[in-house]
Amino acid sequence: MSSLLSKTRRLNKILQKTGTEPVAFQDICTLLSEVLECNAYIVSKRGKVLGYTFSPGFECEAMKKKVIEDKKFPEDYNLTLLESNETLANLYNQGRCVFAEIGDCKTKDKISTIIPIIGSRERLGTLILARFGKEFTDDDLVLVEYSATIVGMEMLRALQEDLADQTRKKAVVQLAIGTLSYSELEAVEHIFEELNGNEGLLVASKIADKVGITRSVIVNALRKFESAGVIESRSLGMKGTYIRVLNEKLLDELKKIK
């Protein structure tokens, strides 16, 4: 039990790095790989590899390609992972690769353990461990299930932070649009129609002539957006003005106005 305690304490140190920074999934994989002498993978619900560590001497080009190059597991394999809502310990590969398209596996003694990552009663991903010729003990499983709980909490926090960030960005855009006069709003709509994307070159005089407004209206509208931090602009002299959208919610909100 003392060995389990020491391993758990090492895991806790990752959490105690700082109370404000998110726990790196890669750090958890590295620790699990080191203390359990195994490969460790953290995969999102959609099969994206969020963190991984291979044990020393691990040789499997198929797995390395999926993890390092593709950074994603095949959809059929990920669906198989999601079918399990409880820990599946010590699964023998029986000479078959986990990826159906590969077929036979060169190693015959691979043992895997699959741990669902759950938060707020929702499946968020999967923690996968694999090693060769040695089953995972009960102490090992206690540690990895504890790790999966931590990962689930971090995934939830990341989702909540992303939601808060998206809400904030949307509010900033709505406030910026609210400061525009009717003619400035009309100018802005035509500006971003001309850009046809998140960045590009704008010739204010051409838009002014096309829409039938003064150039100053366009300049004022751009200044308001730049002050709000939703765009950045840079004068290129006679060529026009280079504009880049900084807040991705801007184009969505302008579409709603139309």
Swiss-Prot record:
**Alphabetical list of InterPro entries matching this protein:** CodY (IPR014154), GAF-like_dom_sf (IPR029016), GTP_trans_reg_CodY_C (IPR013198), Transc_reg_CodY_N (IPR010312), WH-like_DNA-bd_sf (IPR036388), WH_DNA-bd_sf (IPR036390)
- Chief subcellular location equals cytoplasm
Q: Where in the cell does this protein reside?
A: Cytoplasm
UniProt key word RNA-binding: no
Instruction: Kindly indicate which segments of the sequence are annotated as binding DNA.
Output: 204-223
A GO CC term attached to the entry: cytoplasm
Q: Which SUPFAM superfamilies match?
A: Winged helix' DNA-binding domain
Q: Where is this region: GAF domain?
A: 1-156
Highest taxon, organism lineage: Bacteria
Mention one GO molecular function: DNA binding
Biological process GO terms, please? negative regulation of DNA-templated transcription
Keywords per UniProt: Cytoplasm, DNA-binding, Repressor, Transcription, Transcription regulation
> Known Pfam families for this protein?
CodY (PF06018), HTH_CodY (PF08222)
**Task performed by this protein:** DNA-binding global transcriptional regulator which is involved in the adaptive response to starvation and acts by directly or indirectly controlling the expression of numerous genes in response to nutrient availability. During rapid exponential growth, CodY is highly active and represses genes whose products allow adaptation to nutrient depletion.
Instruction: Identify its protein family.
Output: Belongs to the CodY family.
Query: Know the name of this protein?
Result: Global transcriptional regulator CodY
